[in-house]
Amino acid sequence: MANSLRLYLACIKNTLEAAMCLQNFPCQEVERHNKPEVELKTSPELLLNPVLICRNEAEKCLIETSINSLRISLKVKQADELENILTKKFLRFLSMRAEAFQVLRRKPVQGYDISFLITNYHCEEMQKQKLIDFIIQFMEDIEKEIRDLKESVNTRGRLVATEFLKQFM
């Protein structure tokens, strides 16, 4: 793993540890309901300042926190057209299975590739450290999977080109 990626993930992990102090807070508009304030944005006093962590221009993480919820939005690096296509397809595949992840949002925040929504219920049901580790591991795995897919496509392309050019020899 590259040193810049390690530092980027460590920064995100430390920020998540500090931001994941969520508590139960009932909705002020609808009685006996608990809505994530980071999504509704009805009361500005319940929202904290968002934190933007950038590895470079193409890769960044936005962490938005409120009293009862936390939203993490990720922009995955897409260096070329092939990575762009692979990333879009892979993340669309994951978004279609959002129920299996529990904290994954079906639609990402505009300008980002994928988003997670963690509420105080998730922190009560699951361990906070396990949630943080899941998100960090998810980020590592996405980068690794896209790199492997790109390598596989390039290898397959070379093999096809070699077989095609053998016809002319």
From Swiss-Prot:
GO cellular component, one term: cell projection
Biological processes, Gene Ontology terms: actin filament polymerization; Arp2/3 complex-mediated actin nucleation
GO function terms (MF aspect): actin binding
Cystine bridges: none
InterPro entries in UniProt: ARPC2/4, ARPC4
Knockout or disruption consequences: Distorted trichomes and altered epidermal cell types.
Localisation: Cytoplasm, Cytoskeleton; Cell projection
Family annotation (Pfam families): ARPC4
Expressed in which tissues: Expressed at low levels in all tissues with a relatively highest expression in inflorescences.
Keywords: Actin-binding, Cell projection, Cytoplasm, Cytoskeleton
Subunit annotation: Component of the Arp2/3 complex composed of ARP2, ARP3, ARPC1/p41-ARC, ARPC2/p34-ARC, ARPC3/p21-ARC, ARPC4/p20-ARC and ARPC5/p16-ARC. Interacts with ARPC2A and ARP3.
Family to which this protein belongs: Belongs to the ARPC4 family.
Stated role: Functions as actin-binding component of the Arp2/3 complex which is involved in regulation of actin polymerization and together with an activating nucleation-promoting factor (NPF) mediates the formation of branched actin networks. Seems to contact the mother actin filament. Arp2/3 complex plays a critical role in the control of cell morphogenesis via the modulation of cell polarity development.
Name assigned to this protein: Actin-related protein 2/3 complex subunit 4
Species of provenance: Arabidopsis thaliana
